[in-house]
């Protein structure tokens, strides 16, 4: 049985966010590199650094948090995995869903790599819906 790297990334970030951790360490692959690049460009993470440790590459992600001592902690990352190994969900460019009226993003795996819903609509291509982020 293969690993679901997208689910590992989502769970690591979600668990760190809920546990009020500021830094997350994930293994580096081509898919995770593209996924992290999208999260950084869209402003969901503050910093991403790639480093090597014992012949393996890792990403160290710094999450954005809204912490205030007077108010309770607010989760800013809501991630939901859509397509999974047992049930792949595909969409063409016209039927890519809008998340919160365009505030959130959909990350797709297309024939031209991993991209956001906005990029896919502009290029007119569809693909596999990986996750929703809002």
From Swiss-Prot:
* The keyword Transmembrane is assigned to this record: no
Classification via PROSITE patterns: RIBOSOMAL_S8
Cross-referenced InterPro entries, in alphabetical order?
Ribosomal_uS8 (IPR000630), Ribosomal_uS8_CS (IPR047863), Ribosomal_uS8_sf (IPR035987)
A cellular-component GO term for this protein: ribosome
Q: Name one GO molecular function term.
A: rRNA binding
Localization per record: Plastid
Domain of life the protein comes from? Eukaryota
UniProt cross-references to SUPFAM superfamilies, sorted A to Z: Ribosomal protein S8
Q: Which Cys-Cys disulphide bridges does the record give?
A: none
Which keywords label this protein? Plastid, Ribonucleoprotein, Ribosomal protein, RNA-binding, rRNA-binding
| Entry-linked Pfam families | Ribosomal_S8
Q: Which GO terms describe its biological process?
A: translation
Name the job this protein performs: One of the primary rRNA binding proteins, it binds directly to 16S rRNA central domain where it helps coordinate assembly of the platform of the 30S subunit.
Q: Which family does this protein fall into?
A: Belongs to the universal ribosomal protein uS8 family.
NCBIfam families named among the record's database cross-references: PRK00136.1
Q: How does it assemble?
A: Part of the 30S ribosomal subunit.
**Protein name, UniProt field:** Small ribosomal subunit protein uS8c
| Species name | Epifagus virginiana (Beechdrops)
This chain is encoded by the gene named rps8
């Amino acid at each position: 049985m293969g690993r679901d790297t997208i689910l590992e990334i989502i769970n690591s970030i979600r668990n760190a966010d809920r546990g009020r951790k500021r830094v997350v360490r994930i293994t580096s692959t081509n898919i995770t590199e593209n996924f992290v690049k999208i999260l950084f460009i869209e402003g969901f993470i503050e910093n991403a650094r790639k480093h090597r440790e014992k012949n393996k590459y890792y990403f160290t992600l710094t999450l954005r948090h809204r912490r205030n001592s007077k108010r309770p902690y607010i989760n800013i990352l809501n991630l939901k995995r859509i397509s999974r190994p047992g049930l792949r969900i595909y969409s063409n460019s016209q039927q890519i869903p809008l998340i919160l009226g365009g505030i959130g993003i959909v990350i797709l795996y297309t024939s031209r790599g991993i991209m956001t819903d906005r990029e896919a609509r502009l290029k007119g291509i569809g693909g596999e819906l990986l996750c929703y982020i809002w």
